[in-house]
Swiss-Prot record:
Gene3D superfamilies: Hotdog Thioesterase, Winged helix-like DNA-binding domain superfamily/Winged helix DNA-binding domain. CDD domains: hot_dog (cd03440). Keywords: DNA-binding, Fatty acid biosynthesis, Fatty acid metabolism, Lipid biosynthesis, Lipid metabolism, Repressor, Transcription, Transcription regulation. The lineage of its organism: Bacteria, Bacillati, Bacillota, Clostridia, Thermoanaerobacterales. One of its GO terms (biological process) is fatty acid biosynthetic process. Pfam families: 4HBT. SUPFAM superfamilies: Thioesterase/thiol ester dehydrase-isomerase, Winged helix' DNA-binding domain. Belongs to the FapR family. Transcriptional factor involved in regulation of membrane lipid biosynthesis by repressing genes involved in fatty acid and phospholipid metabolism. One of its GO terms (molecular function) is DNA binding. The gene is fapR. It comes from Thermoanaerobacter pseudethanolicus (strain ATCC 33223 / 39E). This is Transcription factor FapR.
Length: 200
């Protein structure tokens, strides 16, 4: 028979866990501690810890300020980590209006949009376009799935950035993309020309 920990000890460990990873859901925490979701919610309320959506939103707001190529509102999902020119992480939870009616599977355009906007966010340029996208959808996604996208700038050659994006639901990779982004010159933006040369 397992020994139950005291409420004080559980709350201390809960606070520690959330400080280490603010993105744990109440369900995940309940499973970790072997208690009900209701118990975790009560513990969080007593400790003054907001729910996961609020914690994610708070972290994301700080990261939106760092993005140069697009505005924070154009990022699909919540930008929870960003090291400009190197890497980034976003979390996205598709809603009911994003699925095919018959199958209830999330439309690929939303998954791609998360990957594309994260790739655009991680590069250190004031403006850019996708020059090439090599993508692969590996498994279907449903409403309720939490998509965690990780982007990494693999290399930069002149005005081209090579970015890999992988999206997972829990530990299963559902999408993979290799993007070549082309940084747009500041002078070009000032001229407002109609054509951009995107070559490989």
């Amino acid at each position: 028979m397992a020994v139950r920990m005291s409420k004080v000890e559980r709350q201390r460990l809960l606070k520690e866990k959330i400080n280490t990873n603010p993105f744990y859901t109440d369900d995940e925490l309940a499973e970790m501690f072997g208690v009900s979701v209701q118990t975790i919610r009560l513990d969080r309320m007593e400790l003054g810890i907001p729910e996961v959506r609020e914690r994610i939103k708070s972290v994301a707001e700080e990261n939106y300020q760092k993005v140069r190529t697009i505005t924070g509102t154009e990022v699909v999902g919540e930008l929870i980590d960003l090291e400009l020119g190197k890497r980034g992480i976003s979390i996205f939870e598709p809603t009911e209006d994003m699925v095919f009616v018959k199958t209830k599977i999330v439309k690929g355009q939303y998954i791609y949009s998360q990957a594309e906007s994260l790739a655009m966010s991680v590069i250190d340029a004031s403006a850019a376009l996708i020059g090439v996208a090599n993508i692969k959808y590996k498994f279907p996604v449903k409403v309720g799935d939490r998509l965690v996208a990780k982007a990494e700038v693999i290399r930069q050659r002149g005005n081209k950035y090579f970015v890999w994006v992988k999206i997972k639901v829990k530990d299963k990779e559902v999408f993979r993309g290799k993007f070549i982004l082309v940084a747009i010159d500041e002078d070009f933006l000032k001229k407002r020309s109609d054509t951009v040369e995107v070559s490989n």
